[in-house]
Amino acid sequence: MISGDSIVALSSGRLPAGVAVLRISGPQTRFVVETIAGGMVKDRVAVLRRFKAPDGTVLDSGLVIFFPGPASFTGEDVAEFHVHGGRAVVARMLEIISGFDGVRHAEPGEFTRRAFLNGKVDLVETEALADLVNAETEAQRRFAVRNAEGVQSELYLSWRRRLIHARAMIEAEIDFADEDDVPGSVSDTVWSDVRAMIGEIDRHIAGFHAAEIIREGFEVVILGAPNAGKSSLFNALARRDAAIVTDEPGTTRDLLEVTLDLGGLRVRLTDTAGLREAPGKVEAIGIEKARAKADRADLLLLLEDILAPGVLGPLPGKAPLLRVGTKLDLLDEGSAREAAGRYDVAISVVGGTGVEALLAEIGRRAADAAGDVGDVLPSRLRHVELLGEANRHLLRAAAEDAAGQELRAEELRLAADSLGRIVGAIDVEDMLDVIFSQFCIGK
């Protein structure tokens, strides 16, 4: 358990607020509670107290809860003061608490860092807590909660346990090659399991893009010729005038982005400059940005004016294409039905026709790309990198023409170490500052 300084911070949201929660963790916690709350309180019970400074000055009235270590979030003694959420109240409470000997203001993520160092959470669970705090959609929340409960960590630890067992079997075969206690078929069983694990890890790595879509968003880029109605559609989907709409071609020269929540999934929609030949110098820069953005898209919306269909030439990007006919309101009913058949979706932003159908189709494609939010997926690039590293060691170990059993066993050890670094079981000190800097002060 960590010893030394105690830390304090505001753990609740932005001030002013109805209630603010101040959290303290460390060896001085009990003394701070006794002093400010006028005596110790029962463990894990919210008690109403008048809070006073050491000189007797009344600071506020509120609830105090004490969580004795190691059965607390950080593994240390922890207390929470629930006070009125005014800026002056919180500032004075923090000033008084941090004024105690051995108590200081917490750094970003320091409470969670102490929880990790005290074995209360592993690194994957820590990252999931950061995702949960930052979750904006239902899919992000569900994904983060599942990983925070240890499902992802357990998968990596189960692979690691299998490798440790495999290595033990191989080393036993090496050490007792002349004994009858070790069956000759042990190595065959071990390498069969290792090859199966290689496939399992490969399939798991393949799910990273789905995890990216859940965490970062499904990228949708609007493309089309100038005046095809891109900015009008963008504004309609954003439900505000985010883009300038005029009859003059080439009005949009920079990328405009808005975030939507479709069926609980985050969807990032980008409006781009109209694609055309021989644009002006500034407009050409916008078109180049549009092409670069399209290269990173998950879905391209190709908009075309139904009254003036044209040929744009080769389109940027390799993402699936959704052809959208615009300005449907300018046609009579019969012509509109005929024209709509040429597109995946035909819309009229002015009348609202087809816009909800387009949103539904985008949402369906986003859901297909994200897959089942309950699937166990690698949630960080570092997971993918370490999983790939583990598999490279396993491939070398499992190769038919591999060197002696000793070297193959060493490759198994290195693979297990790579998996261990994902959850923080070994050698992760260099990653801690990066990971915990993602948290707010009070977490």
Swiss-Prot record:
Subcellular location(s) of the protein: Cytoplasm
Top-level division of the source organism's lineage: Bacteria
Domain TrmE-type G: 217-367
Keywords: Cytoplasm, GTP-binding, Hydrolase, Magnesium, Metal-binding, Nucleotide-binding, Potassium, tRNA processing
Cross-referenced Pfam families: MMR_HSR1, MnmE_helical, TrmE_N
UniProt-annotated binding residues for GTP: 227-232, 246-252, 271-274
Binding-site positions, (6S)-5-formyl-5,6,7,8-tetrahydrofolate: 23, 80, 120, 443
Biological processes per GO annotation: tRNA methylation; tRNA wobble uridine modification
Family: Belongs to the TRAFAC class TrmE-Era-EngA-EngB-Septin-like GTPase superfamily. TrmE GTPase family.
Role summary: Exhibits a very high intrinsic GTPase hydrolysis rate. Involved in the addition of a carboxymethylaminomethyl (cmnm) group at the wobble position (U34) of certain tRNAs, forming tRNA-cmnm(5)s(2)U34.
Subunit structure: Homodimer. Heterotetramer of two MnmE and two MnmG subunits.
PANTHER family (alphabetical): TRNA MODIFICATION GTPASE GTPBP3, TRNA MODIFICATION GTPASE GTPBP3, MITOCHONDRIAL
Name the UniProt record assigns to this protein: tRNA modification GTPase MnmE
Gene: mnmE
